[in-house]
Amino acid sequence: MGTGLRSQSLRGPRPSYGKLQEPWGRPTEGRLRRALSLRQGREKSRSSDGGPERLDTLGQEWLPGSLGDTEQLIQAEQEGSQRWLRQYQQKIRRRWESFVTSFPNVTLSRSASPQPPLGTTS
């Protein structure tokens, strides 16, 4: 009886599947697309086979439209990452500048930006 309940809970969709997000709270387009395609493949497999027992055919059913589609998805995800990084760096720069300006009697001989840690390039 316990195993029946366990297998039943594994078959049902979990509400957190649709909410894939990065730690900063913004959903990643590429991951959401992948989650949706995997979910559609799983539902397609389930409806045609009558259950999740035939998961071995799932990998064969899902094929990307073409290599160009895959490249477009990768490029879109990279552009999103670059956009986030640029926004993050701007936010850090603004915070640093506001921190430095909070000391009115201090003048800096260098530009008002933090030095990157050793071993990294900027």
From Swiss-Prot:
Residues 1-68 are annotated as: Disordered. It holds the Pfam family DUF4633. Coiled coil: none annotated. Signal peptide: none annotated. Residues 1-10 have a biased composition (Polar residues). InterPro entries: DUF4633 (IPR027990). Residues 40-56 have a biased composition (Basic and acidic residues). This is Uncharacterized protein C11orf86 homolog. It comes from Bos taurus.
